[in-house]
Structure formats: C-alpha cells, structure tokens
UniProtKB/Swiss-Prot annotation:
Keywords: DNA-binding, Metal-binding, Nucleus, Repeat, Transcription, Transcription regulation, Zinc, Zinc-finger. GO terms for cellular component: nucleus. One of its GO terms (molecular function) is DNA binding. Belongs to the krueppel C2H2-type zinc-finger protein family. InterPro entries: Znf_C2H2_sf, Znf_C2H2_type. May be involved in transcriptional regulation. A zinc finger (C2H2-type) spans 6-28, 34-56, 62-84, 90-112, 118-140, 146-168, 174-196, 202-224, 230-252, 258-280, 286-309, 315-337. It comes from Xenopus laevis (African clawed frog). This is Gastrula zinc finger protein XlCGF26.1. The keyword Protease does not apply. Its main location: nucleus.
C-alpha cells in the first residue's frame, strides 16, 4: 500500500515496519553490535556485516557485463555500472560537480565547509573523511601495501598505484588544452595548468618565492633549514628530496634513460637532456645583466657572474697555490706540475 506508519523521532524518516525503524535508530545512536571477526569493523545491521564479510573471501558473485569486473554486493555492482553509463545523479549544490553515489557527494560537501571531524592523533591534521584519515595514517606508519609490479615502488593507496602504473604504458588520457601536452593523471594535468595561468598559491615565508604546488614549497623550505634527509648509500652524499636522490643514484648504476632525438646522446637525468637540447635549438634564455652574455643554463650564468665580474677564483692548485675561475683551467694547469 506504500504506507509508512513508523516515524524516526530523530530525522523524521518513515518506515513500513517497526523492525526496520529499530535498525535505522542505530545510525543515530552509533550502535554497531555486529562485529566482523576478521578485521573488527562494526556494523549496525547483520545483513551489512554478511555483505562486508565477502571482502575477506574470494566470493564475488556479481559480475559487470561491460568490463567483467566482479563485486561482492549487488549494490556495489549497480554503483559501478554508473561508470559505464556516465550517470552522476548526485549534484553538489555549491560547485555543480556530479557524483555516482550519494555518500561520495556527502563526503565531497565537507570541502565547502570548515568541518573536518577526523583528527590525526600523530600530527593533529584534520580531515573531512575517515577514509582520508586512514590513508594519511600510513605516512606515519610507513605502510605502503600497494607495490608496482614493474618497478617495485610502494604506495599507500591503491588509486595512487593505478595512476602510477600509467607511466609504464603510453596511456596519457588527459591532454592540456593550452599546449597539447598529455598526462597520465588528471591531478598532474591540473598542476600543469598552473604554468599557463601563472597561479602560484604556495609562498615561502623565508624568501617570498612562490610555487604552483605545495610539495614544491615543502621541498624548497629545506634550502633554508639545510635539511638533507635522503642519503646515497653508495657515496654518502645527502639530498633534500627523495626524487633528487633517485636521479643521483643513476650516476652509480650508469643508467641513462633520457636520449636526445637529435644526436643520440643519453643522460641520467631529464633536466640534463632538456639543457642539452638547447645546444641544438640555440636557445640561451639566461642573460648576464653586467655584460649581456647569454647562457643555456642558469647555473652557468651564476658561475659566470661570480668568476668574471666578482673576480672569484674558487679552484686553487695544491702545488703552487695559484687560483683559477674554472675547474677545467685548473686541471690544464696541473699538467705543468
């Protein structure tokens, strides 16, 4: 008949029978009497526990007819199907972004408020979702359970691993509308777009330099603190960034994965290849304000300024004490002795 005579006094929602209302009340009381014996997670209904239990087994009886992926629950399959249909019926009233599930919309809505009810007990950082907090906790525990089968790098989240995996394929489905460059991840494209817009929202409080990404600022700050936590096990040299250490390691392994398409010369670092390219293009974007001489690399300009215009001679002969502006001149001089 459609009659729902049992009303929840907390939220006003109506139900057809008393038993369903009693189950519903547990949402408001927080009562979760049904505990999973495998992982300890609690649920307010027995049926929800039974569905959850399937994740601890290989039982996935609900296959997707589009892509073949299988699911433990019919409800999860129905939500998954929206990926193929493109259906996003739950729209955020603030920004208009659509979502396939109501719960995802509710979690998203918190970014438009200051509500961050899930604090990290280690560092005090707060999060809008419990799931995000749990992922964040892996930073403190060092847990990286998702391992790339290609290169062995570990990740805290499965989604990060899936995005990373694209670097081992040619799949780059996110093109920049400004310059046409393609990216494996949407997030990387969004960061790249800041190059074209000039947006640099992250500013260093020490020197005022601004950056497009928070991670770039965090790495930059180490210049002021002198912090170099990443040490090479081969030669003991330390670095402020893990990425720089990885690049440095290629010196010891002899790996040179970046090859010049003009002349075939190979390099251990991408930036070395980019600088080398300028030899072929003739590009010299760094000009000396003193004499107007141009250079392909910023570091070469900096060396030029110090040695030519300041008279600095940092390379000293240990035999006779004579100093030189360049290392190669010192090496040539050493042959005299």
């Amino acid at each position: 008949t459609g009659e729902k005579p049992f009303d929840c006094t907390e939220c006003g929602k109506s139900f057809t029978d008393l038993k369903t209302l009693q189950h519903h009340y547990k949402i408001h009381t927080g009562e979760k009497p049904f505990i999973c014996a495998e992982c300890g997670k609690g649920f307010n209904q027995k049926t929800t526990l039974l569905n959850h239990s399937k994740i601890h087994t290989t039982e996935k009886p609900f296959p997707c007819t589009e892509c073949g992926k299988c699911f433990t629950e019919r409800k999860t399959l129905l939500n998954h199907n929206k990926i193929h249909t493109g259906e996003k019926p739950f729209i955020c009233a603030e920004c208009g972004i659509g979502f396939t599930q109501k719960t995802t919309l509710l979690n998203h809505s918190k970014i438009h408020t200051t509500e961050k009810p899930f604090p990290c007990t280690e560092c005090g950082k707060c999060f809008t979702e419990r799931k995000t907090l749990l992922n964040h906790n892996k930073i403190h525990t060092g847990e990286k359970p998702f391992i790339c089968a290609e290169c062995g790098i570990g990740f805290t989240q499965k989604t990060t691993l899936l995005n990373h995996s694209k670097i081992h394929t040619t799949e780059k489905p996110f093109p920049c509308t400004e310059c046409g460059k393609c990216f494996a991840e949407k997030k990387t494209l969004q960061n790249h777009n800041k190059i074209h817009t000039g947006v640099k929202p992250f500013t260093c409080t020490d020197c005022g330099k601004s950056f497009t990404q928070r991670t770039s600022l965090q790495n930059h700050v180490k210049i002021h603190t002198g912090e170099k936590p990443f040490t090479c096990t081969e030669c003991g040299k330390s670095f402020s960034e893990k990425k720089t250490l990885r690049e440095h390691n290629k010196i010891h392994t002899g790996e040179k994965p970046f090859t010049c398409t003009y002349c075939g010369k190979s390099f251990s670092q991408r930036i070395s290849l980019q600088n080398h390219f300028k030899i072929h293009t003739g590009e010299k974007p760094f000009s000396c304000t003193e004499c107007g001489k141009c250079f392909t690399i910023k570091s070469t300009l900096q060396s030029h300024l110090k040695r030519t215009h300041t008279g600095e001679k940092p390379f000293t002969c240990t035999e006779c004490g004579k100093s030189f502006t360049k290392k190669k001149i010192l090496l040539k001089h050493n042959k005299i002795h």
